[in-house]
């Protein structure tokens, strides 16, 4: 029946692509010289699957729905598309990006700024947990070309007219499924009402629940649909191991034994609950191991400091929860440890797929108790991948 969703899109299903053009080099995308410089300086060589497919229709001004997970290069896809379309001489906000978390919004802002480094484009992150007055002053002084933000704060700024929709020609919703599941639906609908009806809409989502389909149906015109399949998400190049710890209480000693190996590069350790993050951090500190920790109960300032230290390499081991798996994108991380296996298997790729993006090599180590064995097999089957017992010389692989 047609009421389930638009053509080619079933609720909770996988969308059907209706765009088959593939451009496999950034040079062939008709991008400006200064943008190309930024792309290559950022370390990209060849566009990823989603970039090969989605940048062109975005630049041509089509509404685009892309079904893709993090780790596929989706942020750069819309960042490049926005930067290509901005009129630099027009000192007005021309693109608006919404993201579900502050971390992700800041991450996107960093990518936009890095890629637009040689263009002089301005991009401001509009997020909760920061000083409203300072933000208002900034927006009033000079409207940034691009705003990236969380729905609540962005709507607030539009509503109070500190942010003008007049010249916004491109509206991007990143991780739309996450935003809607976090209860931002009303704010998102309100933001749509404030934008011009001819604003280009680009929507990215890992899954397509009915509330995401509703947005596409209500606010998008004849959208181009692009699917980047799960297997194009890289577990490739990532060596995955498990350690048989038998019992939960033996994980701590195992982690301490691994500590030397962790600090060869930078490592992220994933835990399933915030309280346990604090518990493990305390235990590690008590044994004189240096680790930093981050989770959703911390305030924004604290999280920023920790991320900064980790990005700069001054802190080497970060303990965190899934909430932040999507907001951590650290080039140097080549080791991920699942102290706890993820409670849902989709999160496995969010955790691991960061370690070795775009062919960067990485190692993932899963700590497995007796009870976890089934879950591990389940993950192997789901991703059609193999997870072997960790060899003794694991340090040589990192």
UniProtKB/Swiss-Prot annotation:
Enzyme Commission numbers on file: 3.6.4.13
Keywords from the named record: Acetylation, ATP-binding, Cell membrane, Cytoplasm, Helicase, Hydrolase, Initiation factor, Isopeptide bond, Membrane, Nucleotide-binding, Phosphoprotein, Protein biosynthesis, RNA-binding, Ubl conjugation
Residues given in the record as ATP binding sites: 68-75
Pfam families: DEAD, Helicase_C
Modified residues (N6-acetyllysine): 110, 166, 185, 230
Compartments (UniProt record): Cytoplasm, Perinuclear region; Cell membrane; Cytoplasm, Stress granule
GO molecular function: ATP binding; ATP hydrolysis activity; RNA binding; RNA helicase activity; translation initiation factor activity
Domain Helicase ATP-binding: 55-226
Enzyme class at the top of the EC tree: hydrolase
Motif Q motif positions after renumbering to this chain: 24-52
GO BP annotations listed: positive regulation of transcription by RNA polymerase II
Residues modified to Phosphothreonine: 150
Keyword Nucleotidyltransferase among record annotations: no
Intervals of motif DEAD box: 174-177
Domain Helicase C-terminal: 237-398
Highest taxon of source: Eukaryota
InterPro entries per the UniProt record, alphabetical: DEAD/DEAH_box_helicase_dom, EIF4A_DEADc, Helicase_ATP-bd, Helicase_C-like, P-loop_NTPase, RNA-helicase_DEAD-box_CS, RNA_helicase_DEAD_Q_motif
Cross-linked sites for Glycyl lysine isopeptide (Lys-Gly) (interchain with G-Cter in SUMO2): 138, 217, 230, 301, 361, 373
A GO cellular-component term linked to this record: nuclear stress granule
Catalytic activity: ATP + H2O = ADP + phosphate + H(+)
Assembly notes: eIF4F is a multi-subunit complex, the composition of which varies with external and internal environmental conditions. It is composed of at least EIF4A, EIF4E and EIF4G1/EIF4G3. Interacts with PAIP1, EIF4E and UPF2. Found in a complex with XPO7, EIF4A1, ARHGAP1, VPS26A, VPS29, VPS35 and SFN. May interact with NOM1. Interacts with PDCD4; this interferes with the interaction between EIF4A and EIF4G. Interacts with RBM4. Interacts with DDX3X in an RNA-independent manner.
The family this protein is said to belong to: Belongs to the DEAD box helicase family. eIF4A subfamily.
Function: ATP-dependent RNA helicase which is a subunit of the eIF4F complex involved in cap recognition and is required for mRNA binding to ribosome. In the current model of translation initiation, eIF4A unwinds RNA secondary structures in the 5'-UTR of mRNAs which is necessary to allow efficient binding of the small ribosomal subunit, and subsequent scanning for the initiator codon. As a result, promotes cell proliferation and growth.
Protein name (Swiss-Prot/TrEMBL): Eukaryotic initiation factor 4A-I
Native source species: Oryctolagus cuniculus (Rabbit)
Annotated gene: EIF4A1
């Amino acid at each position: 029946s047609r009421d389930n969703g638009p053509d080619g899109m079933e609720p909770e299903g996988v969308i059907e692509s209706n765009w088959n053009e593939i451009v496999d080099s950034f040079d062939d995308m008709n991008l400006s010289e200064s943008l190309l410089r930024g792309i290559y300086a950022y370390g990209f060589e060849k566009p990823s699957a989603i970039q090969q497919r989605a940048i062109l229709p975005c630049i041509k001004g089509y509404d685009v729905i892309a079904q893709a997970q993090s780790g596929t290069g989706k942020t750069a896809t819309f960042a490049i598309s926005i930067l290509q379309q901005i009129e630099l001489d027009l000192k007005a906000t021309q693109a608006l990006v919404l993201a579900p978390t502050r971390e992700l919004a800041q991450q996107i802002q960093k990518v936009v700024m890095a890629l637009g480094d040689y263009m002089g484009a301005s991009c401001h992150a509009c997020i909760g947990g920061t000083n409203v007055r300072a933000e208002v002053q900034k927006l009033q002084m000079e409207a940034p070309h691009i705003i990236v933000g969380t729905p609540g704060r962005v709507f607030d700024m539009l509503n109070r007219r500190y942010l003008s929709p007049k010249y916004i020609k491109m509206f991007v919703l990143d991780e739309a499924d996450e935003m809607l599941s976090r209860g931002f639906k009303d704010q998102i609908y309100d933001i749509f009402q404030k934008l011009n009806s001819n604003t280009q809409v680009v929507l990215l989502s890992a899954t397509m629940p009915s509330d995401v389909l509703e947005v596409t149906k209500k606010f998008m015109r004849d959208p181009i649909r692009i699917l980047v399949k799960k297997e194009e998400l890289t577990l490739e190049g990532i060596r995955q191991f498990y350690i048989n710890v038998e019992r939960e209480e033996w994980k701590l000693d195992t982690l301490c034994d691994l500590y030397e190996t962790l600090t060869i590069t930078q490592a992220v350790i994933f835990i399933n609950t915030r309280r346990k993050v604090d518990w493990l951090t305390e235990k590690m500190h008590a044994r004189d191991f240096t680790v930093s920790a981050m989770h959703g109960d911390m305030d924004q300032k604290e999280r920023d400091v920790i991320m900064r230290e980790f990005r700069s390499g001054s802190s080497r081991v970060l303990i965190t929860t899934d909430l932040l798996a999507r907001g951590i994108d650290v080039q140097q991380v080549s080791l991920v440890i699942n102290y706890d296996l993820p409670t849902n298997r989709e999160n496995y790729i969010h955790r691991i797929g960061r370690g070795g993006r775009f062919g960067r090599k990485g190692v993932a180590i899963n700590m497995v108790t007796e009870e976890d064995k089934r879950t591990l097999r389940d993950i192997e089957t789901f991703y059609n991948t193999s997870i072997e017992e960790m060899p003794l010389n694991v340090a040589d692989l990192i």
